[in-house]
């Protein structure tokens, strides 16, 4: 079972234009600093935050309980000009878990409601036992430096990376998995419920459809930090074998 947390800036849209529109650079700085701050705090509890839309962030939070979430909310309130609300949900697939988290928060009021502030809406928490594991795939583009970065313009390379992301997201969401861009040519996919063969089939399909070669290290652990690190190690194994396989699975031993 995987646990997801939705983090939403309270009443953010109206705040950005009150009493007058704020400088765009200031808003970008606020969003970037808030993301880094949240990443640091959730990482201290072995979670992982994805910036998603910056005013709405998603995190994999297995092992992070109600009090942990409340402490993070208080910390943000004390140091920022905004507050955050959170929804938490746990399910067999990441897509279903984030859906439960979203619905729980939506029931407490709209994102731009002036009456909703610093809500923690918990639908469900994943039990903290050895049977509740997180599975994540770290996916990247094969030889992106040689095939894109060093020969195409920066924006055209970015376009191709976004194209790969779009195809991956479209196919993974149908299987109940999620996908997030994590920099460079890298993507992280919380993917509880998917087999190695299903992930490989998706990578093969994308290569056939748009000619972009991909590989995936797949990690399994009791929390997202461990799962992501195992996925990183799996990706290194593929690189060490000259990208000769599509996937490599590593499960953390405890």
From Swiss-Prot:
Reactions mediated catalytically: GTP + 3 H2O = 2-amino-5-formylamino-6-(5-phospho-D-ribosylamino)pyrimidin-4(3H)-one + 2 phosphate + 2 H(+)
Keyword Hydrolase: yes
Highest taxon of the lineage: Archaea
Classification via InterPro entries: GTP_CycHdrlase_3, Nucleotide_cyclase, Rev_trsase/Diguanyl_cyclase
GO MF term list: GTP binding; GTP cyclohydrolase IIa activity
Record keywords: GTP-binding, Hydrolase, Nucleotide-binding
Gene3D superfamilies reported in the protein's UniProt record: 3.30.70.270, Nucleotide cyclase (3.30.70.1230)
Enzyme class per UniProt: hydrolase
Enzyme Commission numbers on file: 3.5.4.29
One GO biological process term: biosynthetic process
Pfam families assigned: GCH_III
HAMAP family: GTP_cyclohydro_3
Function: Catalyzes the formation of 2-amino-5-formylamino-6-ribofuranosylamino-4(3H)-pyrimidinone ribonucleotide monophosphate and inorganic phosphate from GTP. Also has an independent pyrophosphate phosphohydrolase activity.
NCBIfam families: PRK02240.1
PANTHER family linked: GTP CYCLOHYDROLASE III (PTHR42202:SF1)
Similarity field: Belongs to the archaeal-type GTP cyclohydrolase family.
Protein name per UniProt: GTP cyclohydrolase III
Source species of the chain: Methanobrevibacter smithii (strain ATCC 35061 / DSM 861 / OCM 144 / PS)
Lineage of source species: Archaea, Methanobacteriati, Methanobacteriota, Methanomada group, Methanobacteria
């Amino acid at each position: 079972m995987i646990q997801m947390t939705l983090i939403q800036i309270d009443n953010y849209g109206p705040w950005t234009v009150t009493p007058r529109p704020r400088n765009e650079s200031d808003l970008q700085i606020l969003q970037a600093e808030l993301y880094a701050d949240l990443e640091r705090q959730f990482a201290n509890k072995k979670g992982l935050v994805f910036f998603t839309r910056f005013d709405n962030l998603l995190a994999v939070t297995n092992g992070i309980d109600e009090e942990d979430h409340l402490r993070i909310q208080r910390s943000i309130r004390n140091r920022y000009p905004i507050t955050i609300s959170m929804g938490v949900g746990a399910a067999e697939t990441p897509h279903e878990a984030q859906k439960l988290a979203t619905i729980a928060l939506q029931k407490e009021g709209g994102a731009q409601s002036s009456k909703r502030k610093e809500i923690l809406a918990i639908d469900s928490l994943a039990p903290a036992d050895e049977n509740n594991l997180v599975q994540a795939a770290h996916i990247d583009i094969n030889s992106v430096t040689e095939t894109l970065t060093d020969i195409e313009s920066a924006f055209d390379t970015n376009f191709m990376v976004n194209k790969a992301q779009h195809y991956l997201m479209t196919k993974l969401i149908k299987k109940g998995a999620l996908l997030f861009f994590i920099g460079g040519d890298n993507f992280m996919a919380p993917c509880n419920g998917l087999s190695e063969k299903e992930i490989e089939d998706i990578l093969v399909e994308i290569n056939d459809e748009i000619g972009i070669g991909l590989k995936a290290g797949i990690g399994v652990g009791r929390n997202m930090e461990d799962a992501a690190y195992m996925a990183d190690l799996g990706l290194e194994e593929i690189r060490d074998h000259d990208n000769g396989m599509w996937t490599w699975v590593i499960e953390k031993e405890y």
